[in-house]
């Protein structure tokens, strides 16, 4: 299958690569089908969550544990059932990154992680019910530190 995207031109993908968000993404509830775009071989922590339903929409995402190793939250039974999770080790965790003109002001939304069950490609974005994490968490310095210690 192929998709003509705004950011990447034509990309080829297989049906089994499609991640299904039953509820969409908050603010984009009408979008349900996405791809993760990013080269595993490259030493780049960022990936793209590319909408198939609207090829003009793509979100920059990152595994928050790359820059914040202590990032954790509870995955309750309701969430496990919703994603049909058999093994929590198969869950992928991403957060949406905003990269403004001034790169120093780059932030990640730690308050609303994206969780994907890699076993069945079901995904959801949840909003954490605590004050531990910010919607606009500055990440540039933490990324620099993570890569200087790698």
From Swiss-Prot:
Primary location recorded for the protein, binned into one broad class: cytoplasm
The keyword Lipid metabolism appears for this protein: no
One Gene Ontology CC term in the entry: cytoplasm
Gene3D superfamilies membership: BH3618-like
UniProt entry keywords in alphabetical sequence: Bacterial flagellum biogenesis, Chaperone, Cytoplasm, Translation regulation
Transmembrane spans: none
Domain of life: Bacteria
GO biological processes: bacterial-type flagellum assembly; regulation of translation
One Pfam family, short name: FliW
Subcellular location: Cytoplasm
Protein family according to the UniProt entry: Belongs to the FliW family.
Identification of the protein by name: Flagellar assembly factor FliW
Organism: Caldanaerobacter subterraneus subsp. tengcongensis (strain DSM 15242 / JCM 11007 / NBRC 100824 / MB4)
Higher taxonomy: Bacteria, Bacillati, Bacillota, Clostridia, Thermoanaerobacterales
């Amino acid at each position: 299958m192929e998709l003509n995207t705004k950011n990447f031109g034509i990309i080829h993908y297989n049906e089994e690569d499609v991640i299904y968000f039953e509820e969409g993404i908050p603010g984009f509830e009408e979008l349900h089908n996405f791809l993760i775009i990013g080269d595993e071989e490259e030493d780049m922590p960022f990936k793209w969550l590319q909408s198939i339903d609207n090829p003009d929409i793509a979100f920059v995402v990152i595994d928050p544990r790359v820059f914040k190793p202590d990032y954790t939250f509870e995955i309750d039974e309701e969430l496990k059932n919703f994603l049909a999770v058999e093994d929590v080790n198969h869950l992928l965790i991403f957060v949406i990154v905003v990269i403004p003109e001034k790169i120093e002001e780059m932030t990640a939304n730690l308050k609303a992680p994206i969780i994907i069950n890699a076993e069945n490609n079901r995904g959801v974005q949840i909003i954490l019910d605590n004050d531990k994490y910010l919607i606009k968490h500055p990440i540039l310095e933490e990324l620099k530190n993570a890569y200087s210690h790698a």
